[in-house]
UniProtKB/Swiss-Prot annotation:
Pathway: Carbohydrate degradation; pentose phosphate pathway; D-glyceraldehyde 3-phosphate and beta-D-fructose 6-phosphate from D-ribose 5-phosphate and D-xylulose 5-phosphate (non-oxidative stage): step 2/3
EC number(s) stated in the UniProt entry for this protein: 2.2.1.2
Domain of life, per lineage: Bacteria
Gene: tal
GO biological process, one term: carbohydrate metabolic process
Biological source species: Burkholderia pseudomallei (strain 668)
Protein name: Transaldolase
Organism taxonomic ancestry: Bacteria, Pseudomonadati, Pseudomonadota, Betaproteobacteria, Burkholderiales
Subunit structure: Homodimer.
Amino acid sequence: MTTALDQLKQYTTVVADTGDFQQLAQYKPQDATTNPSLILKAVQKDAYRPILEKTVRDHAGESAGFIIDRLLIAFGTEILKLIPGRVSTEVDARLSFDTQRSIDKGREIIKLYEAAGVGRERVLIKLASTWEGIRAAEVLQREGIRCNMTLLFSLVQAAACAEAGAQLISPFVGRIYDWYKKQKGADWDEAQDGGANDPGVQSVRRIYTYYKHFGYRTEVMGASFRTTSQITELAGCDLLTISPELLQKLHDSTEAVARKLSPDEARDARLERVAIDESSFRFQLNDDAMATEKLAEGIRLFSADAVKLEKMIEALR
């Protein structure tokens, strides 16, 4: 029997969301994504501790931030040995509201990859989908540095990223699901509120439809999944980035997977363009309590994990 994972690959490019690159060969993803939290998780494992220790040792006199950048590149280059496509490497979330420093950091990451023999076409620079992050992506894209816009929870963020010419966006599913489930509390009914009605699934479907309807070339990569049903409900999305745990569940399943998203259907939809000048962007994002709260929370969490990583580095000196 064909596995659910193999069926999904007929409609969608499968991406592995992990810093644990030893698991990649098993699932044969096209691309891989990382973030500070995933790298922090990986370096706490015995298998990856030597990478951290060597990076600290090789750059003993440098700042923790300098070492983190080299650590990200060390993981990225190892990942690229195991996949045919691209790896996403994230700009420090503490720069999420600083356009120029985000641009500088994106350029620096690409230079480090190129110095390691990796072409920029194999790297996506991850930036938070703040107004400032989107403006940074606009500049980097013009320089041939491709960007992956993360912490994306709303259509207005997606529309602004597309207008800026971002290579790819990563709209989150699971974190949207979490927010609405918490809001409903005891009234949440998984049978009624999950599946195709899952708010996170609906958000990605809405963004995908908007992009295909208006002919944007920016790729849509659904991210942050809690269940395999969230994944299979988005079969047909350009890409889906999936944790090793959920990749394993899809690999072990033979449940039928049908295409759910289609560019042809999207082109026939009746839609209006979203206003994405700065004041309209900020107002629409502010008007969406879920997106506002989850964007802020995501930046805080990624920033906190960057600080934890810095402390680990300092402890090894």
